[in-house]
Design a protein with these regions (language model features):
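Bacterial N-terminal signal peptides
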Residues: 7-15
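Lipid interaction determinants
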Residues: 17-90, 95-189
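Positively charged n-region of N-terminal signal peptides that target proteins for export
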Residues: 1-4
Length: 189
């Protein structure tokens, strides 16, 4: 009887191991915290800059926290994106299947007041927030590892290329600190 129970237990353990996701080399390289930056396009009528603080976990979940900001003479118009997703990477392709997402304004009180009083800024604010409602639950990106701590990613939805750097353990850049501050102020998902 003991042998039967023991062999059944071992069989269950082995079958669980067989179905576990085997990480690709690219996935192993991605695990950790990254900061990514998209500079505004030189000739863009709307110079939007993005910073993303991305945490890739071994269990194939990812936590994205980012800001998009528009520099105006009145101050920064800021938007906060937070998302949770399942991720996979291989052969230069990174994909996300979103499980939760939150996109909200993160303007300073002064800038929010100016936006409220300006029809032009109000329309711009509305226009900027609305496209995310059509983002879908799946995103594919093309990635190129330049080194173990540097990569570029091309977002196939926004057609933007970001430059990414892997953060060392405990490292907090000024952009990461700003993102964490905004998440704390605005609430996390």
């Amino acid at each position: 009887m003991r042998k039967l129970v023991l062999s059944s237990f071992i069989a269950v353990l082995l079958s669980g191991c067989a179905t576990a996701h085997q990480q690709t080399e690219q996935e192993k390289a991605l695990v950790g915290d990254w900061i990514c930056h998209v500079k505004p396009a030189a000739k863009s009528p709307l110079p939007v800059e993005h910073f993303d603080y991305v945490t890739y976990r071994v269990d194939q979940t990812v936590l994205l926290r980012g800001i998009s900001q528009i520099d105006t003479k009145e101050g920064w118009m800021r938007y906060l994106l937070q998302a949770k997703a399942k991720w996979q990477a291989s052969d230069g392709k990174l994909s996300y299947d979103f499980t939760d997402r939150l996109f909200k304004t993160a303007h300073s009180p002064q800038v929010a007041k100016i936006i409220e009083q300006s029809p032009e800024f109000k329309e711009l604010d509305k226009e900027f927030v609305s496209p995310c409602s059509n983002c879908g639950d799946h995103l594919d990106m093309k990635i190129k590892m330049k080194s173990p701590t540097r990569m570029t990613s091309f977002n196939t939805y926004t057609k933007e290329t970001s430059q990414c750097r892997k953060l060392s353990a405990g490292e907090k850049t000024k952009e990461v600190k700003l993102i964490e501050k905004l998440v704390e102020e605005k609430g996390s998902i």
